[in-house]
Amino acid sequence: MTLKEEFATRNFSIYGQWLGILSMILCFALGIANLFTFRVLIIILSAVCLASSFVILFIEVPLLLRICPTSSKFDDAIRKITTNYMRAAAYAVMAVVQWLTLLSAATSLLAAAVFLSFTCICYLLAGHQGPGLCRQQDPGRRRRRADDCMSGRARLPWA
């Protein structure tokens, strides 16, 4: 299935996954870029943005929990974020934190806030749309048919 065909399925869970990957890249790049400023609030929020990129990495690629040596508390916290609604809540919290950069100044961290907000909306729509989370094995490659994701027959790969 091509990328165009995947976007034509109107499966918001896959949209959320793609936007999550883009959000992770943006959070990493903008977190580093905004560390070098003289505003204390911006430095703190850019460090949070940088940390958010690694949290997003573990949320979107759960296989890393088995590969990377992390604490059991961190593993348990990430494993709780398995449903579309929980992912939407996690992305909403990260988006609100980045929207707080407006308290100090308008910086490029707002781009991360916008993408995190869009990701939150996609996961909310996916939760409202139907049964459970449908994921890809890796971007551009199908794990199962899109019909399985929409009908509830799909299982989480780590379940």
Swiss-Prot record:
Q: Which InterPro entries match?
A: TVP18/Ca-channel_flower (IPR019365)
Q: Name one GO biological process term.
A: vesicle-mediated transport
Q: Where in the cell is it found?
A: Golgi apparatus membrane
- Asked whether the UniProt record includes Glycoprotein among its keywords, one would answer yes
Chief localization class? Answer: Golgi
Q: What does this protein do?
A: Golgi membrane protein involved in vesicular trafficking.
Descriptive protein name: Golgi apparatus membrane protein TVP18
Protein's gene: TVP18
